[in-house]
């Protein structure tokens, strides 16, 4: 689920396995709060809506959709993700929470959904992991959305956890080593999200852009730093280095210090953290 660029199998003994369960613990309520902030722009979902949760992950977007609807029997959610483990967890949550959802393992760039089938499409923090900035997936969403249908997408204008990871990498690895999630900062500019939408087939006059702050509650700073470095630290083209095991504690301390200096950082009761993110949100009509 962490989309590594390297095929190297080595990892430090301290590194936690990047499972869907670790992902859920790491992001806390981040993806659900991002989804809530995004779908707030397009509510309500009328009866008969067929809503597409693309890049659904373990179900944060669907959870936000369901929470916004009084009669869930009146809607249908179609969810896809390319990660089979994520789909397995999604299906477990769907069954446990009685979601009106169908989930399949699919590539968002080549969907099996018929043309003009969907009334709505929601894409939460998924474009940046796709080739060509997700343009091919955007074309598929355009194809499957009904004329007059509504789509909502987002990207991060500010994240408090990327600088700490990259600072740890710079300070504990040889000069010139590729940075984890290098190039992610290009998504801070909302113009990139808008460009991808337009290249996908949508018309500029039907796109509305905005920004929203998203406040996220997660675990203690110690646990969060361990999860963050485990999940993302080895995802660059260099993968994990053998020296990372020796310098693990140093990297964790750097991450913790950088997090404490981030905008909006707050330690809550019970040692939990509140972190502030800022999202670019795009609402578009077909």
Segments from the language model and where they lie:
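A short acidic, Gly/Pro-enriched loop at the edge of an enzyme's catalytic core
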Residues: 109-121
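Conserved class I S-adenosyl-L-methionine
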Residues: 2-52, 60-68, 86-89, 93
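A short SAM/SAH-binding and catalytic strip from SAM-dependent methyltransferases
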Residues: 119-134
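Conserved catalytic/acceptor-binding region of the Class I
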Residues: 135, 142, 146-221, 278
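Conserved Class I S-adenosyl-L-methionine
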Residues: 187-192, 196-199, 203-286
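Class I SAM-dependent methyltransferase SAM/SAH-binding core
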Residues: 50-111, 136
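A generic alpha-to-beta junction signature in SAM-dependent methyltransferases
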Residues: 43-45, 69-70, 130, 145, ...
């Amino acid at each position: 689920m962490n989309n590594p660029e390297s095929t190297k199998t080595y990892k430090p003994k301290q590194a936690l396995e990047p499972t869907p369960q670790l992902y859920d613990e790491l992001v806390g309520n981040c993806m659900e709060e991002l989804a809530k902030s995004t779908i707030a722009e397009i509510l309500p979902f009328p009866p008969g809506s067929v809503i597409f949760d693309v890049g659904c992950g373990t179900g944060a977007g669907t959870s936000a959709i369901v929470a916004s609807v009084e009669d869930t029997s009146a809607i249908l959610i179609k969810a896809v993700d390319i990660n089979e483990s994520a789909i397995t967890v999604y299906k477990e949550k769907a069954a446990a929470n009685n979601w009106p959802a169908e989930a399949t393992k699919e590539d968002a760039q080549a969907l099996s959904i018929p043309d003009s089938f969907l009334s709505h499409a929601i894409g939460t923090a998924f474009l940046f992991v796709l080739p060509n900035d997700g343009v091919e997936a955007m074309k598929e969403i355009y194809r499957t959305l009904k004329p007059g249908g509504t789509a909502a997408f987002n990207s991060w204008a500010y994240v408090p956890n990327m600088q700490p990871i990259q600072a740890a990498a710079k300070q504990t690895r040889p000069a010139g080593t590729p940075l984890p999630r290098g190039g992610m900062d290009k998504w801070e500019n909302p113009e990139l999200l808008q460009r991808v939408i337009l290249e996908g087939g949508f018309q500029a006059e039907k796109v509305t852009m905005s920004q929203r702050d998203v406040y996220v509650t997660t675990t203690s700073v110690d646990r969060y730093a361990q999860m963050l470095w485990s999940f993302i630290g080895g995802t660059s083209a260099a993968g994990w280095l053998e020296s990372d095991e020796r310098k693990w504690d140093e990297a964790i301390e750097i991450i913790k210090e950088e997090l404490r200096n981030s905008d909006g950082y707050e330690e809550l009761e019970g040692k939990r953290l509140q972190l502030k993110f800022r999202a670019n949100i795009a609402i578009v009509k077909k």
